[in-house]
Amino acid sequence: MPRRKILVLAKLNNKRFMHFRHFITELGKHADVVIWDKDRWEIGRILRILKGRKFSPDFIFCYDFAYNYALAPRVYGLGSINIPKGVYYIDLQTQTEERKKYVRENKIDLVFSPTKDFFHRTLPELKDKFRWLPFSNNPDIFKDWHLKKDIDFLLMGRSWSAWYPFRNLVLKKMTGLKGFVYHKHPYEGNPEGRKVYIGEEYAKEINRAKIFFTCGTKFNYPVRKYFEVPACNTLLIAKGNKDLKELGFINGQNFVECTDDNFYDLAMY
């Protein structure tokens, strides 16, 4: 079978795109992939340019347009072509109505998302187009770095009480406890000049921990940390959600499921 040709509409130069860049690199081993990141172009013009380069896509993969197209280019006229098209949606809690409109107006055939239960709860109208594409790790980064386990308890990332109530609870309960370390999200601002953990440094910091706490936000879905932490050979203590069983997470075997009431006792045990 000839290799498929996939046109990806995404702004890969964004720092937050590290995971997706790694995904595209892996995809490129199985298909011919071209990235388009220029804003405000007509799809017909793009296709003519690519045809001149002897590339005619079999499929167009559109990255999430949310946050004012911060991660994807504005491309016009997608609904006027008959090439199969898919869109990848991540933060489903934002711009929900716009997401439905985008699929409808651009005649999107498939909608990919890393969450299943949350997708069905949030965008039930699109369930027939839904394809589950869970988060994945680059094994060259998220692995056992064989570092000394000198952090007893680690919490990383955002901890706003409105969006991350469990992380906020952990932070309040564990702050001041010997062996507990908390690092803010790298994009929350850094006026104090603290060390920022991204890529390998992030994975290595996880690898130093014996126990890592996280949750799936107030919306209860598996964020990337559910995949990154076990890959770094660190015990994950986390809130459960409906996607985990299908993803292969087994309480007591490859992670420890907790509640607001028992996470501290489980960690101490």
Where are these regions (language model features)?
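C-terminal "capping" alpha-helix adjacent to the active site of nucleotide-linked donor transferases
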Residues: 259-269
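A short acidic/histidine/glycine-rich donor-binding loop in glycosyltransferase catalytic cores
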Residues: 252-258
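Nucleotide-sugar donor-binding catalytic core of glycosyltransferases
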Residues: 2-55, 62-80, 84-251
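Small/polar loops that bind or transfer phosphate-bearing groups
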Residues: 214, 258-259
